[in-house]
């Protein structure tokens, strides 16, 4: 599986230790991993696209074969622009599987030369979601176990400015 470029797309709002774990493991499986940070206007992220790209770059710095790029539009257009051959997706629970399985099937119908590879998180990250991390942070809870210290600082600043 080493040859080729794998694209790990997501909103990453914020970039969690679960995301980082998946990137670390993917970096051992593929020659190159591109973290594709999606604009995701429909989700109304608390961080701007530029902020999310910078946060992700900071977190993935230790992985020499990983780079980060933002995108707006169709994932497949981004994948082609990055010369990607594989879409990486994380699966935490059965609910993730159902949605991701449908997406992988649709992508295979539309783009038969692109594969989707699913990775499950390490046990300690199984229940982390960026949505939960954001909500806990908004309510003043401690999310230090779920994000890197640099992410924590930015997240705390962002939620305190919105109160």
Curated annotation (Swiss-Prot):
Substrate binds at residues 11, 43, 75, 89. The keyword Transferase applies. ATP binds at residues 11-12, 19, 90-92, 100, 125-131. It is an enzyme of class 2 (transferase). GO terms for molecular function: ATP binding; pantetheine-phosphate adenylyltransferase activity. The record marks 19 as: Transition state stabilizer. Keywords: ATP-binding, Coenzyme A biosynthesis, Cytoplasm, Magnesium, Nucleotide-binding, Nucleotidyltransferase, Transferase. Homohexamer. This is Phosphopantetheine adenylyltransferase.
